[in-house]
């Protein structure tokens, strides 16, 4: 198991909380909570050791524009592919944007 942390610039705080995915399904889960301070912080707990560069590249693409909400994201990963990670992130961000 490996724990990774990342931080990116962000805009206004997320409007709500969100949960996407289920780690028990051999996939991953994304937990998102609003945060103050104009920063998006991400913590990844993964079963794949040495995967830090892959996560960094994925997040750099997803959060390249400073339009991401200020939030704290926790990801519990069980070897999900980058496509699934992006899908779950987008689902959580969309859910957090609803009232």
Swiss-Prot record:
Similarity remark: Belongs to the MdcC family.
Molecular function, one GO term: acyl carrier activity
PTM summary: Covalently binds the prosthetic group of malonate decarboxylase.
Pfam families reported in the protein's UniProt record: ACP
Main location per the UniProt record: cytoplasm
Compartmental location: Cytoplasm
Species annotation: Pseudomonas aeruginosa (strain LESB58)
Name this protein carries in UniProt: Malonate decarboxylase acyl carrier protein
Name of the coding gene: mdcC
Keyword Phosphoprotein: yes
InterPro entries: Mal_deCO2ase/Cit_lyase_ACP (IPR023439), Malonate_deCO2ase_dsu (IPR009662)
Spans traversing the lipid bilayer: none
Its biological purpose: Subunit of malonate decarboxylase, it is an acyl carrier protein to which acetyl and malonyl thioester residues are bound via a 2'-(5''-phosphoribosyl)-3'-dephospho-CoA prosthetic group and turn over during the catalytic mechanism.
């Amino acid at each position: 198991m490996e724990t990774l942390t990342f931080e990116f610039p962000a805009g206004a705080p997320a409007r709500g909380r969100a949960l996407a995915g289920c780690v028990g399904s051999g996939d991953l889960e994304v937990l998102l909570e609003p945060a103050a301070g104009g920063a998006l912080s991400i913590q990844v707990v993964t079963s794949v050791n040495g995967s830090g560069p892959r996560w960094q590249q994925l997040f750099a693409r997803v959060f390249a524009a400073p339009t991401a909400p200020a939030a704290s994201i926790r990801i519990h990963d069980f070897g999900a592919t980058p496509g699934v990670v992006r899908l779950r992130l987008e689902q959580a961000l969309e859910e957090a944007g609803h009232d």
